């Protein structure tokens, strides 16, 4: 509970399987991270600054786990929502970095193949297990990570500069992947190499 005696259950959080949520009034996406921080702030608590790992990742895991087995059902019927979907789609398929890879190069064209001993995951299902406990991250003592932490890591691996977590690019990508996973059930948390 918060210092005021209330908790997250008193906040306007959407079901986990419907995030990100398009907000027509602001023409922006509400991510679970942003909604959790807004709830903290509205109740006199400090927002969590590190939105890529640690406390935020564990909080997301707890909230999303309550919706395990619920199929992804993100609404993108509004015109503004479709524009966000298109931004995410363009990001997913655009080549970037010194290696000139897109998200699709790894997770569509080469899914199932091995890179440096790791099998590349298929794009279908990305996001439904996040946040994740990752073995590689545990070596540094910070094993939990959000989707945006992983996006940043992917960008670095193709030798592109990562974008800001919760920035426009990664929010659009998260939205695109969530819509592409319509019908795929949530399974949180998950473990990755």
Q: How does the language model describe each region?
A:
Residues 67-96:
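Electrostatic cytochrome c docking/interface patches
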Residues 2-58, 65-69, 94-193:
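Electron-transfer interface patches adjacent to heme c in soluble/periplasmic c-type cytochromes
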Residues 33, 37, 60, 82-85, ...:
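Hydrophobic core segments within long, regular secondary-structure runs in both alpha-
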């Amino acid at each position: 509970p918060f210092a005021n005696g209330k908790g997250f259950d008193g906040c306007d959080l959407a079901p986990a399987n419907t995030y990100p949520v398009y907000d027509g009034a602001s023409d922006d996406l509400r991510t679970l991270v942003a909604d959790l921080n807004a709830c903290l702030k509205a109740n006199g608590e400090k927002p969590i600054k590190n939105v890529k790992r640690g406390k935020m990742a564990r909080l997301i895991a707890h909230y999303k786990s309550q919706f395990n087995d619920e199929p992804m059902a993100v609404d993108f019927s509004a015109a503004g929502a479709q524009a966000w979907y298109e931004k995410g789609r363009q990001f997913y398929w655009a080549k970037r970095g010194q290696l000139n890879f897109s998200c699709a190069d790894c997770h569509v064209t080469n899914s199932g193949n091995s890179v440096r001993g790791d099998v590349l995951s298929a794009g279908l299902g990305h996001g439904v297990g996040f946040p994740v406990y990752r073995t590689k991250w545990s070596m540094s003592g910070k094993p939990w990570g959000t989707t945006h932490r992983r996006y940043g890591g992917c960008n670095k691996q193709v030798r592109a500069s990562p974008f800001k977590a919760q920035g426009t690019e990664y929010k659009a990508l998260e939205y695109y992947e969530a819509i592409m996973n319509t019908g795929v059930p949530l399974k949180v948390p998950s473990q990755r190499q």
